[in-house]
Amino acid sequence: MPETNRIEYKRELNIDVDIEKEVIAFLNYHEGGVIYIGIDKTGNVVDVSDADGDALKIKDRIKNNISPSAMGLFDVVVEERKGKEIVKITVASGSEKPYFKKKYGMTD
């Protein structure tokens, strides 16, 4: 299944993946969407080495780094595809648009 405007694939969760940005895009989109961690851009399943740990990190990042609160608008689960573990993030369209990434640090 190829990527679409409602499906996004990420090979892995690493420093280069701004998962908050992806979630915010779906929160602000009128239909929401699904993000898969552990599937590459061509749709091939790759194993997530610590799927449970990644799922917890993702939940924490969404909860703490997005405003207004996205609680109740997303679900993060570990699934098995082709014998490998992946992380599936289902995001509903938010009702308090626009959603944005919180900034941290001192302000002027």
For the regions a protein language model found, what residue spans apply to each?
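Conserved N-terminal catalytic/coupling substructures associated with nucleotide/phosphate chemistry
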Residues: 1-108
